[in-house]
Regions:
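Predominantly the C-terminal beta-signal and adjacent terminal strand-loop region
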Residues: 47, 275, 288-291, 295-324
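Outer membrane beta-barrel
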Residues: 29-164, 254-261, 267, 272-285
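Membrane-embedded hairpin module used as a gating/binding unit in multi-pass transport
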Residues: 146, 158-215
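Residues that define the transmembrane beta-barrel architecture of outer-membrane proteins
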Residues: 16-18, 24-32, 81-86, 138-142, ...
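Outer-membrane beta-barrel pore domains and translocons
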Residues: 11-17, 50-54, 105-107, 160-164, ...
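Transmembrane beta-strand segments of Gram-negative outer membrane beta-barrel proteins
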Residues: 2-21, 43-47, 55, 122-123, ...
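Detector for outer-membrane/organellar transmembrane beta-barrel domains
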Residues: 42, 151-157, 195-285, 295
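Outer-membrane beta-barrel translocator domains and adjoining extracellular loop/strand segments
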Residues: 18-26, 58-63, 113-119, 168-180, ...
Length: 324
């Protein structure tokens, strides 16, 4: 294998945000992504390295976590910015249009996907338009993804088996902790999804389960597993596209037990317009003074500058996240 056999891709994202809140400081964050794929006769290697700057402890992303899904993507055990290998996996090309990916994976990339609301670097910046708030995804973790491509008689199927805790979920944020699979506090994340993909429309439904125990609200020792269902509808025609998301989770242990989101995108001569609104509902057993349902909304306009590889994206958001 030579350097010519490796396909490289990457990008840099810088975000400046100011909030209409005297208690919150303006914040500048930055991140970088580098992908390397190596094609082999039986499959493909994928490596993903990402880095992010240190967040401002009094900045916008600290007080309003959903408004910048690109912030805090890589943190050290002390809470500072860092660099890490987030994906390192191999995809086997199996017979009958099937693939099997194993290694260090991103579970959220395989469930609850949308054509216009899934990537904070080139689409909506607000995290509520990247993934469903009710799905308790692990961070980058060890696991496997079996994908069965669809055809005219069946939908595309995705099956996931992964660790319940990823790098950012662990106290030391280390690969050594990630490999410690004997911890009593850990379990597995199971996910299944079905997708019907057409030229103009797409339908996705799925279910997920975490086997690690969560303490039921109001109890000190009674536990249950968190689980849920999700659905995504997509539509596109000409310059217009629409994305609708919903989800439910176990209200006994999940703070966010219901979610609904709507996103719209329109291509114009000058750039890409996006408008979205999402509502995250708090479970009744977790509701208390100062904690209530959350609202996220965003309008952005992505403008290419000096070609198609550079963009400037003004974004206005209105959020309410009491107690989240």
């Amino acid at each position: 294998m030579s350097a010519a056999d490796v396909d490289w891709a990457g990008g840099v994202t810088a975000v400046y945000q100011h909030a209409d809140d005297s208690n919150v400081e303006s914040e500048l964050t930055a991140s970088a992504d580098l992908f390397a794929t190596i094609a082999r006769p039986t499959g493909e290697w994928l490596f993903y390295i990402e880095a992010s700057s240190s967040p401002n402890p009094n900045g916008v992303s600290a007080f309003y976590p959903t408004v910048n899904a690109d912030a805090r993507s890589v943190l050290t055990r002390n809470g500072g910015g860092g660099i890490q290998i987030s994906k390192a996996n191999y995809t086997f090309y199996l017979h009958d249009s099937r693939t099997l990916m194993v290694g260090l994976i991103d579970v959220s990339a395989w469930l609850d996907r949308g054509r216009i609301a899934n990537d904070e670097n080139i689409q909506f910046l607000n995290g509520s338009f990247v993934n469903n708030a009710t799905i308790e995804f692990p961070d980058y973790t060890l696991g496997g993804v079996l994908r069965i491509l669809g055809n005219q008689s069946r939908p595309e199927l995705t099956l996931i088996l992964a660790g319940s805790d990823g790098i950012a979920d662990l106290p030391d944020r280390s690969y050594q902790d990630l490999l410690d699979l004997t911890s009593d506090e850990r379990g597995v994340f199971l996910g299944v999804g079905a997708s019907w993909l057409y030229d103009r429309t797409s339908w996705r439904i799925g279910a997920w389960l975490r086997t690690d125990d969560d303490v039921i609200a109001g109890s000190e020792s009674v536990t249950e597993t968190n689980h849920g269902l999700y659905g995504v509808y997509g539509w596109q025609a000409g310059a217009n596209a629409l994305n609708v998301r919903f989800g439910i989770a176990n209200s006994a242990v999940a703070i966010a037990d219901r979610f609904a989101g709507l996103a719209y995108q329109r291509k114009t001569r000058l750039g890409l317009l996006g408008i979205g609104v999402a509502r995250t509902y708090i479970s009744p057993v977790f509701r208390e003074p100062g904690r209530d349902n959350a609202l996220d909304s965003e309008i952005y306009f992505r403008v290419p500058v000096f070609g198609e590889t550079r963009h400037i994206t003004p974004s206005i958001q209105y959020v309410e996240n009491p107690g989240f």
